Amino acid sequence: MDKLSKEQRHKNMAAIHSKDTKPEMIVRRGLWKRGFRYRLNHKRLPGHPDLVLKKYRTCIFVNGCFWHGHNVMYDVRCKTEEIIESSECCKIPKTNREFWVNKIRRNKERDKEEQRKLAAMGWHCITVWECELKPSKREETLESIAFTLNHIWLQDHQPRITAYPQQNEEDMQMPMAAEGDVV
């Protein structure tokens, strides 16, 4: 049974927003401080990524561990939709469990499909989890994002080396700059 009344639960759930969340603001400020520029919630791209860095052809999704099922796996051995919680960052509620399991499963499937579409369009995707932005891990996570973005840029802008076609022995004879053999 739920510990909160129906009205209290409704109020809590209504207060949850999908834009300008605390984890998203941490990532935005961290990237801005490191010199990265981005657009927010790009409507024309699948999944409306939280941050879009066009220069790097990269989309960043800042996901809440609960809503996107971080470290939640489904037990394929069971015929029913049994869920295995493998970390503390995503605990499935005991009340209305079937609803939450299905909701999180659909969210994970949707996320995977959106990232597949973005990859097909030539975009790179980075997912940042809410638990990776805890104070003890925050700087390491932000440095990792910056490193990944720089790596992507270097890969996409490395010089292209073109191999020249092989030539026949006859074609390779160089013209003489001096006089030929004197007889």
Which residue stretches match the model-derived regions?
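Nucleic-acid endo/exonuclease domains
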Residues: 1-127, 131-183
